[in-house]
Amino acid sequence: MKIRVGFGFDVHQLVEGRELWLGGIRLEHSKGLLGHSDADVLLHTVCDALLGAANMRDIGYHFPDTAGEYKNIDSKILLKKTVELIATKGYRVGNIDATICAERPKLKAHIPLMQETMAAVMGIDAEDISIKATTTEKLGFTGREEGISAYATVLIEKD
């Protein structure tokens, strides 16, 4: 069996007038994330980590923000396409370990649904997806609630 590890990072600005999508679910919040797609920072981070693990560049290469077809796209579609892309090289998702960094909204109660949603999109077990939420103790842009960032480490494998 061959295994590879990938790392992803993404950040999006919080703005008024947009819905907040994280981990494939819509959250009630006064602001949403700015981006060409639905700006789901967690799913984008996981896509980048998966693509990096398979040595297939990054999310911007495969789904450029200059392409009209990706305007306001549901990031679950991008995640599904990413899993399909790594499958062309014989890889499948082993596990995911991700961290969301945001002051608000508080995310703990939403994590199980994020795990279930992401697992359904990728065709893996929810127990293979770890999602943690933290703050920066009011420091930096996330601490000032100007944006949300996310980090992910993934393991992909093939026989």
Swiss-Prot record:
Cofactor(s) for this UniProt protein: a divalent metal cation
EC number(s) per entry: 4.6.1.12
Q: Identify the residue position(s) of the site Transition state stabilizer.
A: 36, 135
Functionally, this protein is described as follows: Involved in the biosynthesis of isopentenyl diphosphate (IPP) and dimethylallyl diphosphate (DMAPP), two major building blocks of isoprenoid compounds. Catalyzes the conversion of 4-diphosphocytidyl-2-C-methyl-D-erythritol 2-phosphate (CDP-ME2P) to 2-C-methyl-D-erythritol 2,4-cyclodiphosphate (ME-CPP) with a corresponding release of cytidine 5-monophosphate (CMP).
Extract the signal peptide range.
none
Name under which the protein is recorded: 2-C-methyl-D-erythritol 2,4-cyclodiphosphate synthase
Q: Which residues bind a divalent metal cation?
A: 10, 12, 44
Q: Which organism is it from?
A: Bacteroides thetaiotaomicron (strain ATCC 29148 / DSM 2079 / JCM 5827 / CCUG 10774 / NCTC 10582 / VPI-5482 / E50)
Question: Which keywords does this chain's UniProt record carry?
Answer: Isoprene biosynthesis, Lyase, Metal-binding
Q: Which domain of life is it from?
A: Bacteria
- Positions of 4-CDP-2-C-methyl-D-erythritol 2-phosphate binding: 10-12, 36-37, 58-60, 134-137, 141, 144
Enumerate the catalysed reactions. 4-CDP-2-C-methyl-D-erythritol 2-phosphate = 2-C-methyl-D-erythritol 2,4-cyclic diphosphate + CMP
- Under the GO molecular function aspect, what terms does this record hold? 2-C-methyl-D-erythritol 2,4-cyclodiphosphate synthase activity; metal ion binding
Per the UniProt entry, what are the Gene Ontology biological process annotations, in alphabetical order? isopentenyl diphosphate biosynthetic process, methylerythritol 4-phosphate pathway; terpenoid biosynthetic process
Q: How does it assemble?
A: Homotrimer.
**Which HAMAP family is this protein grouped with?**
IspF
InterPro entries listed in its UniProt record = MECDP_synthase, MECDP_synthase_CS, MECDP_synthase_sf
Q: Which family does it belong to?
A: Belongs to the IspF family.
Pathway noted in the entry: Isoprenoid biosynthesis; isopentenyl diphosphate biosynthesis via DXP pathway; isopentenyl diphosphate from 1-deoxy-D-xylulose 5-phosphate: step 4/6
Sorted alphabetically, which Gene3D superfamilies does this protein's record hold? 2-C-methyl-D-erythritol 2,4-cyclodiphosphate synthase (3.30.1330.50)
Free-text cofactor note: Binds 1 divalent metal cation per subunit.
